[in-house]
A protein has these predicted regions:
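Short alpha-helix boundary/capping motifs
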Residues: 101-105, 163, 227, 256, ...
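ABC transporter nucleotide-binding domains
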Residues: 2, 6-201
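Short alpha-helical
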Residues: 66, 85, 103, 188, ...
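ABC transporter nucleotide-binding domain
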Residues: 166-253, 257
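Conserved NTP-handling cores and scaffolds of large molecular machines
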Residues: 101, 218, 241, 280, ...
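Residues that scaffold the ATP/ADP-binding catalytic core of kinase and kinase-like folds
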Residues: 68, 141, 214, 286, ...
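C-terminal coupling/interaction segments
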Residues: 255-301
Length: 301
């Protein structure tokens, strides 16, 4: 379990984290989301003892990281997949870390197999793709068989097969009762991977809830329809309390009534429908609605 209590971090006049509190519980894949500069990496570094908070506490299994006994056996992390000695092989890299942490050589072979790196384990790291380096970083995180895993953008550089594999792998780790915290900018992948989400913006907590609940609470749902009597139907729908937005191509976008109610109303008036499409909001829609005011830099067209 990871517990943050009123965590704050200031860099001179800049407040990177502002009274941030949340708990990451075992048995779940928890997505950690926020715009660039929101404070995600700073939060992870403080949890791992790589930076000190200005105020508040960050605990792993009830203790600060610097007070954990055999920390690699308590929490595994991947913050930067490129932070590797390019002249070493994956096997040598893992063996060196294992030896310094009292971990046997057998475990090195196990994590190489778990992460699909066994066939390239004796190649030098400087010949690896980013996706291969991500797998090696994950192997390091797993060396101590820890109950807590923290991973910063772990799918960067992975191909489609690799992303699907890591999604199922994280779910399997959570099903074993581990605490899994994953940050990512890929909303479509987070929607498939994480069953709980923590969202921060400008160092403050914006949301802490199950994925489906966050989508339902922060995104709009609508129905797209087409009809040769669109103007007439729009008037009927508005009279029923719906909001109707005509589109340039003649379609109507309706909120406030579901597809079944719209279809029933059209049928009672003998109005033909050429299309009636319920549109489910995505995690990306919900995320953009939630974090819109926390983005520091907006593009223009």
């Amino acid at each position: 379990m990871i517990e943050l209590d009123r965590l704050s971090k200031r860099f001179g006049p800049v407040t990177a984290l502002d009274d941030l509190s949340f708990t990451v519980r075992p048995g779940h894949v928890t997505g950690f989301l926020g715009p660039n500069g929101a404070g995600k990496t700073t939060t992870m570094k403080i949890i791992l003892g790589l930076d000190a908070p200005s105020a508040g506490t960050a605990l792993v299994n009830g203790r600060r990281y610097d007070r954990l006994v055999r920390p690699l056996h308590q929490v595994g992390s991947l913050l930067d997949a490129t932070a590797l000695h390019g002249g070493r092989t994956a096997r040598l890299h893992l063996t060196s870390i294992a030896r310094s942490n009292g971990i046997g050589r057998r475990r090195v072979g196990e994590v190489l197999r778990l992460t699909g790196m066994e066939a390239v384990a004796d190649r030098r790291v400087n010949g690896y793709s980013l996706g291969m380096k991500q797998r090696l970083g994950l192997a390091v995180a797993l060396l101590g068989d820890p109950p807590v895993l923290m991973l910063d953008e772990p799918v960067n550089g992975l191909d489609t097969e690799g992303i699907g594999w890591i999604r199922q792998f994280f779910k399997a780790l959570a099903a074993e009762g581990r605490t899994v915290l994953v940050s990512s900018h890929l909303m479509s992948e987070m929607a498939l991977t994480a069953d709980h989400l923590i969202v921060i913006g400008r160092g403050k907590l914006l949301a802490d809830m199950p994925t489906a609940q966050l989508i339902a609470a922060n995104a709009r749902h609508d129905v797209l329809l087409r009809s040769p009597r669109a103007a007439e139907l729009a008037g009927l729908l508005t009279a029923r309390g719906a909001t109707v937005t005509p589109q340039p191509d003649g379609a109507l976008v309706v909120t406030g009534l579901d597809a079944a109610a719209i279809g029933d109303l059209a049928a009672t008036r003998g109005i033909a429908l050429h299309a009636l499409v319920p549109r489910q909001a995505s995690l990306e829609d919900a995320y953009l609605d939630l974090t819109g005011e926390s983005v520091d830099y907006h593009g223009t067209r």
